[in-house]
A protein has these predicted regions:
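Hydrophobic transmembrane alpha-helices and their helix-loop junctions in integral membrane proteins
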Residues: 1-169, 187, 193
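Hydrophobic membrane-spanning alpha-helices of multi-pass integral membrane proteins
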Residues: 4, 99, 177-190, 210-215, ...
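Hydrophobic, aromatic-rich alpha-helical transmembrane segments
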Residues: 45-48, 52, 131, 135, ...
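Predominantly late transmembrane helices and immediately cytosolic-facing juxtamembrane segments
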Residues: 59-63, 131-172, 179-183, 196-200, ...
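Alpha-helical transmembrane segments and their helix-start/interface "positive-inside/aromatic belt" motifs
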Residues: 87-96, 171-186, 334-339
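Hydrophobic alpha-helical membrane-insertion segments
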Residues: 96-104, 180-199, 274, 290-296
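Hydrophobic alpha-helical transmembrane segments of multi-pass integral membrane proteins
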Residues: 97, 144, 184-190, 242, ...
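Aromatic-capped, Gly/Pro-kinked transmembrane alpha-helices
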Residues: 203-233, 237, 249-359
């Protein structure tokens, strides 16, 4: 449960500061996987499976809509180079808007039925750790709304920021791409309402015969009827407030956060570079492993092992053969020297080893 909350918060905070359209959606996926882990940690496996199924629809719609935008804009992935595409890609805009609102758990869209329920279940466990998970999930939900607004605004609603040539060639995707977009948009709206009773309905067995939840962990009823209405509506209220605030700031200056102060630049860099985890990981672990590999390759593989292995043996045989080949020089004096040297060696062996039988 704690791991899921940290994952959801981490991925949402990192995704908020990304500028690549595919990275934003990818970190959003990571954040929603954290929400599923929260549900699993609460032993609400049916809710986790419900969120998995519903999340698949609107996230697939987001990825396909992003692909439609990339197809129109010449594979440009930085949405700071987009803007004004609502007039060129109205269908893609509609699908991405619906999928983003479902991702942000706007009421009565598919994401609302599972995502908000997971947050409510965290509070309904009534323990310190579950309260911590609840607040981390609420913050992650607010971040989700923020980067959804950022993605929609900078891609479709702001002024054109890209090269003129991209806009001249931009067009809506063909029907083989738009038909799946329409289907996923409809699922992002209706699938949650259709499947809610199957997954978490009080009067339906649903997955009761395939998923076992211990009676001590059944908190769905207490959460549904005993949770204060304020705690149920808090994620939605904060998300709407943050969405309005971000729209106002984006309308004034889309890049206000970067250029406001040096501190804000450092904060932006910190989250954009994923808490510097990759930098620390590369310098502390990867660099050491690569250096160890270099030493191993230089000293062992190309050093000791080569010296005593194939290269060393080949050189030894070659040098020995060259040495013995030097005796074949045609010189009678050298032949005599070799012959008498061999005779002396035999005599020494006979004298030093009395029991040896040489003759």
């Amino acid at each position: 449960m704690i791991i899921g909350a940290i994952t959801a918060f981490f991925a949402a905070s990192v995704g908020l500061f990304q500028n690549d359209i595919k990275k934003v959606i990818a970190y959003s996926t990571m954040s929603q996987l954290g929400m599923m882990v929260i549900a699993v940690g609460l032993s609400q496996y049916n809710v986790a499976l419900m969120h998995l199924v519903l999340h698949a629809t609107y996230k697939a719609g987001l990825f396909l809509a992003a692909g439609s935008v990339l197809h129109a804009m010449g594979d440009q992935q930085d949405f700071r180079r987009y803007g004004g595409l609502v007039q060129i890609l109205p269908l893609t805009y509609t699908v991405m808007l619906i999928a983003s609102l479902s991702l942000a758990a706007l009421p009565w869209l598919s994401g609302y039925y599972s995502k908000d329920l997971i947050i409510e279940l965290a509070y309904g466990s009534y323990s310190f750790s579950s309260y911590l998970v609840y607040w981390l999930s609420v913050i992650a939900a607010c971040f989700t709304m923020l980067y959804s607004v950022k993605l929609i605004y900078l891609t479709f609603l702001s002024y054109a920021q890209g090269p003129k040539g991209n806009y001249e060639k931009a067009h809506e995707s063909p029907w083989v791409m738009t038909i799946p977009l329409i289907i996923l948009a409809l699922l992002s709206v209706y699938l949650g309402y259709i499947t809610k009773d199957f997954f978490v309905g009080l009067g339906s067995q649903g997955l009761g015969n395939s998923i076992f939840i211990h009676p001590n962990h059944i908190i769905l009823i207490d959460t549904e009827f005993g949770l204060p209405i304020f705690n149920k509506l808090l994620p939605l209220i904060l998300s709407i407030i943050f969405a309005i605030f971000s729209l106002y700031l984006f309308e004034k200056n889309p890049f206000f956060f970067i250029f406001s102060s040096k501190i804000s630049k450092n904060i932006y860099r910190f989250f954009n570079q994923r808490y510097w985890f990759e930098l620390i990981y590369n310098k502390s672990i990867i660099k050491g492993v690569l250096y160890l590999g270099y030493i191993t390759n230089t000293v062992l593989d190309r050093g000791i092992l080569e010296f005593i292995g194939p290269r060393g043996a080949a050189q030894a045989v070659y040098k020995i053969s060259i040495y013995f080949a030097s005796f074949d020089s045609g010189s009678i004096a050298r032949y005599g020297f070799v012959m008498y040297s061999g005779l002396l060696l035999i005599l020494l062996l006979w004298l030093l080893i009395p029991n040896i039988d040489l003759f």
